[in-house]
């Protein structure tokens, strides 16, 4: 089997990670003690991707839980599925990172990283054929962002040919813990651009807007935001966890989704959007699902896809439905909105269907888009970064941990380069190839 090792780092990473395991354990019929009580062979067919089989038919998540302070992991341990995790896989410090990227990346995190790598090695050794790693973390804090990116680069060194996939929560002033989030996020993106193969950008701004506007929750809690995250994570990993043909492993997904190595930041979407504990009164039709899935209001990144173009798209439909209808609707979307898909990558939309719907829904659809509009998210963070950095505000917290201002400047320009690269491919057309021969005519244009 092709296994995935899951790592969750920091407070946010552990909270969304714990939710992810609750949701997928439920989908695979695994109870909180790790026993199987399911009703379908499909649930067990690819269970080994995310779970180890222990003695007594117990299924144990291939999960490593990391934090620089014990608090969040204690909550996970005492939470609904806390007993399913392997006790040795909790790795934590006592000092905390104090929302400081430098502490996570260079000082406190660097001291803990070797004990995490020991557990990573142990998990990888129990795999038959490891396909890669997935990390859940946020980019706004200290541990998930600083230590998370440190772990990525260390794992990259040791497993250069394995896929590195992240679920990265982007900070937003609407749901803010700290004022230095733009610093931490920019320093992290600087790392992610170079060291990951696939990054799902889960944007707190978008999650907040969905809760507030669509779900009409006046004061969304982290629990409400995380409900959306877990639905999305369950959706995008469906093809990895259930039998199917399309994007059935991390590498195939990367091959379909990433046309240029640096442009691997995906915009996830989900339909139908429901709030926690609400029941759906009627099942959506396939046309409604398709329409909602491509709607900017359903995107988990606060970017409007109509402001950019799709390089590639993957769609995952779940539930019992007609494949023919799904294909028709997906073609329909592309034909009606052809200007929003780059024409120089033909057939850049791929669709998968899985029979098992998520709990509480008859049908759902998950969207993964590699859109040039994701630059809006990076621009937003870059503007906030620049505002503080030009005054050198709060820098002493970072230089005090041994960082150099130069690293900030490099991170800033790397993120701005990323924005320009997205823009370049947004403007590119299919017939530009021939224009290089006619140098002379170019000047008049």
From Swiss-Prot:
It holds the Pfam family Tubulin. GO terms for cellular component: cytoplasm; microtubule. The modification 5-glutamyl polyglutamate is found at residue 438. GO terms for molecular function: calcium ion binding; GTP binding; GTPase activity; structural constituent of cytoskeleton. CDD domains: beta_tubulin. Highly expressed in neuronal cells. Some glutamate residues at the C-terminus are polyglycylated, resulting in polyglycine chains on the gamma-carboxyl group. Glycylation is mainly limited to tubulin incorporated into axonemes (cilia and flagella) whereas glutamylation is prevalent in neuronal cells, centrioles, axonemes, and the mitotic spindle. Both modifications can coexist on the same protein on adjacent residues, and lowering polyglycylation levels increases polyglutamylation, and reciprocally. The precise function of polyglycylation is still unclear. Tubulin is the major constituent of microtubules, a cylinder consisting of laterally associated linear protofilaments composed of alpha- and beta-tubulin heterodimers. Microtubules grow by the addition of GTP-tubulin dimers to the microtubule end, where a stabilizing cap forms. Below the cap, tubulin dimers are in GDP-bound state, owing to GTPase activity of alpha-tubulin. PANTHER family: TUBULIN. This is Tubulin beta-2 chain. It comes from Gallus gallus (Chicken).
């Amino acid at each position: 089997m092709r296994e995935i090792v899951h790592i969750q780092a920091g407070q946010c990473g552990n909270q969304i990670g714990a939710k992810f395991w609750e949701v997928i354990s439920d989908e695979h019929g695994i109870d909180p003690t790790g026993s199987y009580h399911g009703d379908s062979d499909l649930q067990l067919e690819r269970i080994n991707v995310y779970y180890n089989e222990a003695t007594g038919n117990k299924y144990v998540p291939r999960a490593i839980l990391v934090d620089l302070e014990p608090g969040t992991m204690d909550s996970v341990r005492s939470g609904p599925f806390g007993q399913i995790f392997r006790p040795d896989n909790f790795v934590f410090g006592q000092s905390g990172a104090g929302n400081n990227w430098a502490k996570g990346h260079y000082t406190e995190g660097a001291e803990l990283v070797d004990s995490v790598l020991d557990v990573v090695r142990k998990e990888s050794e129990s795999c038959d054929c490891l396909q890669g790693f997935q990390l859940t973390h946020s980019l706004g804090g200290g541990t998930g962002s600083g230590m998370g990116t440190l772990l990525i680069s260390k794992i990259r060194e040791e497993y250069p040919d394995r896929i590195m996939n992240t679920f990265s929560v982007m900070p937003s002033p609407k749901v803010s813990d700290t004022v230095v989030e733009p610093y931490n996020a920019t320093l992290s993106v600087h790392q992610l651009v170079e060291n990951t193969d696939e990054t799902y950008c889960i944007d707190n701004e978008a999650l907040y807007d969905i809760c507030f506007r669509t779900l009409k929750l006046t004061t969304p809690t982290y629990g409400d935001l995380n409900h959306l995250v877990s639905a999305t994570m369950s959706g995008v990993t469906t093809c990895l966890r259930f039998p199917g043909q399309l994007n059935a492993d991390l590498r195939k997904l990367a091959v379909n989704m990433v046309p240029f190595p640096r442009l691997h930041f995906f915009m996830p979407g989900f339909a139908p959007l429901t709030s926690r504990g609400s029941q759906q009164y009627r099942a959506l039709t396939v046309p409604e699902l398709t329409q909602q899935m491509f709607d900017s209001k359903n995107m988990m990144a606060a970017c409007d896809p109509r402001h950019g173009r799709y390089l590639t798209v993957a769609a995952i439909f779940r539930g019992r439905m007609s494949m023919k209808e799904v294909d028709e609707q997906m073609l329909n979307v592309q034909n009606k909105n052809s200007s929003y898909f780059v024409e120089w990558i033909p057939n850049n939309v791929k669709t998968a269907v899985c029979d098992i719907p998520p709990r509480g829904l008859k049908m759902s659809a998950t969207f993964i888009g590699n859109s040039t509009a994701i630059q809006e998210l990076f621009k937003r963070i870059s503007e906030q970064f620049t505002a503080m950095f030009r005054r050198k505000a709060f820098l002493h917290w970072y230089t005090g941990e041994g960082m150099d201002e130069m690293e900030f400047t490099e991170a800033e320009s790397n993120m701005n380069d990323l924005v320009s690269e997205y823009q370049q491919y947004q403007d590119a057309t299919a017939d530009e190839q021939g224009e290089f021969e006619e140098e002379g005519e170019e000047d008049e244009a």
